[in-house]
Amino acid sequence: TGMRIGEVCALRWEDVDFRQKVITISYTAGRIYNCESRTTERTFTSPKTRNSYREIPISRQLLFALKEVKKISPSRFVVGTSGRPEDPRSYRDFFARLLKRLNIPHIVFHGLRHTFATRCIESQCDYKTVSVILGHSNIATTLNLYVHPNLNQKQRCIERMSNFLKIK
């Protein structure tokens, strides 16, 4: 989905529309530093920008997975079982342990967001749509920080340019 970890942790079942096949991002979970106690406190707040409020279409694969999780989930939140938003730090640690247990090379959770954006662009999705799905207020953020062309894409680009110019 390209969701931020705080958005994943704050996702409630009521934000998942199975009929319309859409996830609505309306909250985020996080931590804020308390200067007096010198500790962090968990937060459940509205997203950071106007563009962060958004609807994300659900793929067939994710729709199936969400329906299966909903059958066994006692929580009002999609992630976790406590009845309150999962702590992003704890979920990040869980994700790292899961990758290790499955013998999958380590990737930071935020790397999934980069991979999502890159795969969308590789699939010929237009930049503006990808930017909106990610919740960016500026398309330049999407292009500069999240889209990573691979060698095949660069080779195809050169081939297209050569064909256009009729260079053999």
Regions inferred by a protein language model and the residue ranges of each:
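Catalytic-site neighborhood detector that most strongly recognizes the C-terminal catalytic loop/helix
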Residues: 29, 134-160
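C-terminal secondary-structure termini that scaffold catalytic or DNA-interacting sites
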Residues: 20, 31-53, 60-62, 81, ...
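Short, basic (Lys/Arg/His-rich) helix/loop patches that form interaction surfaces
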Residues: 1, 56, 64, 71-136
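Short, charged phosphate-coordinating catalytic segments
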Residues: 1-30, 128
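Short, polar N-cap/turn motifs at the start of nucleic acid-interacting alpha helices
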Residues: 15-22, 125-145
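Residue-level signal for well-ordered alpha-helical positions
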Residues: 11, 68-69
